[in-house]
Design a protein with these regions (language model features):
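Extracytoplasmic gate region of multi-pass secondary transporters
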Residues: 6-49
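Intracellular juxtamembrane helix-capping segments at the cytosolic ends
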Residues: 110-123
Length: 187
């Protein structure tokens, strides 16, 4: 029933937003650095590099952090770190934006593994169905968000597009509050 799937729709929303942001950074960070912060050519790939590097390194520690703090707290903390990262990206300063992309990688690194962990521990529906819902939302976000960002940026500018990503990360914080209230998901 829909009542049993509802927590996984929340997880799917988080997955959509976070994987969407990942896709947007992969596709748009270099152009953002080039056009908005006016970064020199040798730094335009730095946003994606630092994002990927921090994401990779932090994923090695995610399980330890999860055991210590719990999945929902890790998701909220990751969204908070990514939100701070977007604030730095939106500063318009090349070096602050580079640090911001690094913080995006650090923050987002733990969110998707935790979302998948929660879905896989479902006690209300088959965990494979829960994972399918969450992964489907996430990959849809990864594919659609860069396109939407392109349309928004074409009409309003890259800064507005990245502001939208920042706002969406704030939405993740709100969704974790509602996720915490659900009894069907172990944190």
């Amino acid at each position: 029933s829909l009542r049993h799937i509802k927590p996984f729709i929340l997880l799917g929303g988080i997955s959509f937003i976070v994987m969407g942001s990942e896709g947007a950074i992969v596709d748009w960070s270099a152009l953002y650095l080039q056009e908005v912060t006016l970064a020199p050519d040798y730094l335009v790939g730095g946003g994606f590099f630092l994002f990927s590097l921090c994401m990779t390194i932090a994923r090695f520690f995610g399980d330890q952090w999860s055991k210590r703090f719990g999945s929902i707290q890790i998701i909220a903390f990751g969204a908070l770190v990514a939100g701070i990262g977007y604030c730095l990206v939106l500063s318009g300063n090349t070096y602050l934006a580079l640090i911001g992309f690094a913080l995006n990688g650090l923050g987002f690194s733990v969110v998707i593994p935790e979302v998948f962990r929660i879905a896989g521990q479902s006690n209300t529906i088959d965990p494979t169905k829960a994972m399918s819902v969450v992964a489907g939302f996430g990959y849809s976000g990864f594919l659609l968000t860069p396109v939407v960002l392109g349309v928004v940026s074409e009409n309003f500018g890259l800064s507005v597009g990245f502001l939208g990503l920042f706002i969406s990360v704030l939405l993740v914080l709100i969704l974790t509050y509602f996720l915490r209230k659900k009894n069907t998901v172990r944190s």
